[in-house]
From Swiss-Prot:
tRNA processing as UniProt keyword: no
GO biological process entries: L-asparagine biosynthetic process
Name listed for the protein in its UniProt record: Aspartate--ammonia ligase
Pfam families: AsnA
Amino acid sequence: MEKLFIPKDYKPLLSLRETEVAIKELKDFFEDSLAKNLNLTRVSAPLFVNKGSGLNDDLNGIERPVSFDMKAIPEFNIQIVHSLAKWKRLALHRYEFKHGEGLYTDMNAIRRDEDLDNIHSIYVDQWDWEKIIDKEERNLETLKETVRSIYSTFKATEDFIVSKYPHIEKILPEDITFITSQELEDRYPDLTSKERETAICKEFGAVFIIGIGGKLASGEKHDDRSPDYDDWTLNGDLLFYYPLFDEAVELSSMGIRVDEESLLKQLKIAECEERKELPFHQMLLEGKLPYTIGGGIGQSRICMFFLRKAHIGEVQASMWDEDMIRTCEENNIHLL
């Protein structure tokens, strides 16, 4: 069994059936609110892509995608997506979206190398979204303005859930707090990245950490990011303090995407310049793709957070080892 935290005297606030109803209500409300706040149109999304397209998300560069061949197109190496970070940018181009317009998808993925715990599963479900901006809008103000719009959706969703289930108490602060990963390291130099996240979230409740992927003054990274979608200076993670765990929980990762210059720079730093030859990267370097901002928002994470669940398996059906299943059942954690 991987790391599993059991909250003391945990009792779910909703029954299994109530939970299933609440999941649907919550997802519908959040999705509608997000689309309205960011001017997004829902589009259909692929479950798998061809490896040779360069469209799959390489995450931290070491995770193995689920792959298979197919009878009809034997020359293709098909991969289950990790996320749609690069696919969305291409879709905005293909579907002829305009400045200020965006898309979102219901993204389902399998991350076979994920370490299982209370908030991590091999099954990933998230709203993947992407929006067109001008080159001049590739700045921190655009990033912060978008984060505030997304946070307003979180706030409205909490209000909605509390109105439906009054025994669930509000915990989100009125406003989101911004801090850079370097400021965070300077503030807590003796803590690990994850410990810093919890420390700052315990203080402010809801925090957006700016600048993830590049090295800090210490020579360490706050966290890893693939070099070919986020600009490491204009991205970040949205985290909330979760009292049930007494820890910070990441609900969303997002950022302004790489332009031609930052793509080349980050590919060089990451020592994977060979990706320049892939179709997606060629289109980007030739200026054929729009400048964008985008991200992913975890659906199960949101349901877990707002319904005050102790395990992500209480809001999604996935695969768990027998020890984890037994321990959860012994502690009122009812996995779907």
